[in-house]
């Protein structure tokens, strides 16, 4: 496909999103885990300000739907907890005390486990590269009463024997169905380039309105589900062709269109793995496992496979990291200051080469795939400690713990950066800051929004790329940020103010991708400027207080000298 038609297709696809959106293994290093050994999971035998009215409607609809899903899961957990309490209250108490004893008395450093590459590939073959024999499109509504069906809509080609026959499901447009059948036929014949071309044609048909047989009665969710399915098939085609760079944006878009389907996140994890972006792959796998549980998934074999993949990606991220090392500390009670100091002492003894700067994440708690159980409340949680060889590499983390607005600048004049300053700041963000934040978030499901979500940093990084006219990289970063934004309502409860901010960020991100200009500044740039002004005011205050302190000390010294002179005379 030539460049002109590629741009045409990109614009056509973006038009659909605009209307339907809501929002080789190195074992030389060690990861420390206190008390709990990180065992390898066993392999078992066998998912604006509105640019258009629909975008806000779908965002709000998804937020409401997510709340109802979480309420149901919460009610189930409360019932289970009440049942355990009725059976006997002594048993949980003994278990809690055992955890405290482990933390206090058994500070053990465990070697990093090794998960063979074959196991990782097995997971991908079973959950990512699935090729369904029968063509079936599902628009599954919530089955809250049964608890056995997915609770969010999904569009997927599946084996017809694996699901009930729903007669009310919307019918696909006949021309689109022909294009998809031809593409699937090419895929099964391992003609992946031809299949990708057919799927691109299908996507273009979608952009022209040929999605469902009754387009005027179709909901935006149903249309988005079909488009998401086509995007996922393009992801698998490009992965088969060993072109993960081409698959990346399609993986992001599939999540934007259908964030509730766990396989979309797992496919994104596979793309990140192929690109050797292991921290991001780990986070995607973690979200996939959570979405599988949130959607009513009950097959433990699938969850074990996803957790194995998540664990493998964390392992690889740690072994590849050169500037820092990590330690996870399990705990069951409130974190006390003496415990934090004890953890830091253990870290210093365990990793003396990484003790120039030690950071303990007190903002949010972390989970590991070896022990996480989404159905238990709360799941086993860990305190994350990072140590750095170079103090400057981790110093920016101070701002994360002390500021609500995530901004990073190394310049005294942040509002008038030269091109050289912009390049320097872009490299700092891309090579030092974002990789560490991505690693922190690989075991952190629901950090605060926007401060700990990682989205603002990515959008600010995209702004730097835009200033340097690196359009392709900017597009990828924005697509990734949009996928994160679309997923946030499923991971945590958000307030009305946060929902409005999320919609504004999504709308501005969409406008940026489409090349639209308006008189208003992008939301993330405004937030960054507010943060920079706040930084400037803090610096002025610090400078004033230091000057005042020096002046007071000088006056006191002068006064003492005068008294001494008077006494001597």
From Swiss-Prot:
Keywords: Cytoplasmic vesicle, Developmental protein, Differentiation, Golgi apparatus, Spermatogenesis. One of its GO terms (cellular component) is acrosomal vesicle. InterPro entries: SPATA16, TPR-like_helical_dom_sf. It is found in: Golgi apparatus; Cytoplasmic vesicle, Secretory vesicle, Acrosome. GO terms for biological process: spermatid development. Essential for spermiogenesis and male fertility. Involved in the formation of sperm acrosome during spermatogenesis. Belongs to the SPATA16 family. This is Spermatogenesis-associated protein 16. It comes from Macaca fascicularis.
């Amino acid at each position: 496909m030539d460049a002109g038609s590629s741009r045409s297709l990109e614009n056509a696809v973006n038009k659909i999103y605009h209307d339907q959106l809501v929002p080789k293994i190195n074992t030389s290093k060690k990861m420390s885990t206190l008390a709990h050994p990180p065992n390898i999971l066993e392999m078992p035998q066998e998912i604006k300000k509105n640019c258009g009215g629909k975008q806000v409607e779908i965002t709000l609809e998804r937020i409401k739907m997510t709340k109802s899903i979480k309420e149901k899961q919460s009610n189930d957990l409360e019932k289970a907890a009440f049942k355990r309490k009725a059976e006997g209250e002594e048993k949980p108490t003994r278990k809690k005390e055992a955890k405290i004893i482990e933390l206090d008395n058994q500070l053990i450093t465990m070697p990093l486990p090794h998960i063979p590459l074959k196991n990782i590939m097995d997971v991908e073959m079973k959950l990512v590269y699935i090729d369904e024999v029968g063509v079936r499109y599902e628009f599954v509504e919530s089955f809250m009463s049964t608890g056995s069906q997915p609770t969010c809509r999904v569009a997927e080609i599946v084996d017809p024997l694996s699901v009930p026959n729903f007669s009310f499901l919307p019918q696909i447009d006949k021309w689109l169905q022909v294009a998809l059948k031809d593409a699937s036929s090419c895929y099964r014949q391992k003609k992946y380039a031809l299949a990708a071309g057919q799927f691109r044609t299908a996507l273009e048909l979608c952009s022209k309105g040929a999605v469902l047989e009754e387009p005027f009665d179709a909901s935006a969710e149903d249309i988005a589900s079909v488009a998401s399915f086509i995007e996922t098939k393009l992801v698998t085609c490009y992965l088969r062709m060993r072109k993960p760079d081409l698959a990346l944006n399609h993986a992001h878009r599939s999540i934007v269109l259908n964030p509730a389907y766990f396989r979309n996140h797992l496919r994104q994890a596979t793309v990140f793995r192929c690109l050797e972006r292991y921290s991001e792959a780990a986070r995607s796998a973690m979200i996939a496992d959570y979405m599988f549980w949130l959607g009513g998934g009950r097959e433990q074999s699938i969850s074990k496979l996803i957790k194995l993949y998540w664990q493998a990606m964390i392992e690889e991220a740690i072994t590849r990291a050169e500037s820092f090392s990590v330690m996870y500390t399990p705990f069951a009670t409130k974190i006390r200051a003496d415990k934090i100091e004890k953890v830091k002492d253990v870290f210093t003894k365990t990793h003396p080469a990484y003790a120039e700067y030690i950071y303990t994440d007190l903002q949010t708690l972390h989970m590991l795939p070896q022990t996480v159980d989404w159905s238990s409340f709360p799941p086993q949680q860990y305190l994350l400690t990072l140590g750095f060889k170079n103090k400057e590499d981790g110093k920016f983390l101070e701002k994360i713990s002390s500021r609500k607005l995530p901004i990073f600048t190394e310049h005294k004049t942040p509002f008038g950066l030269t091109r050289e300053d912009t390049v320097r700041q872009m490299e700092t963000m891309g090579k030092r800051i974002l990789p560490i934040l991505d690693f922190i978030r690989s075991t952190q499901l629901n950090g605060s929004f926007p401060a700990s979500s990682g989205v603002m940093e990515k959008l600010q990084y995209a702004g730097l790329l835009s200033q340097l006219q690196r359009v392709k990289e900017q597009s990828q970063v924005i697509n990734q940020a949009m996928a994160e934004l679309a997923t946030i309502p499923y991971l945590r409860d958000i307030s009305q103010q946060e929902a409005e901010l999320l919609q504004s960020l999504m709308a501005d991100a969409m406008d940026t991708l489409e090349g639209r200009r308006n008189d208003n500044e992008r939301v993330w740039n405004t937030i960054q400027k507010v943060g920079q002004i706040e930084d400037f005011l803090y610096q002025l205050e610090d400078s004033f207080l230091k000057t005042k302190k020096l002046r007071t000390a000088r006056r006191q010294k002068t006064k003492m000298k005068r008294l001494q002179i008077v006494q001597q005379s």
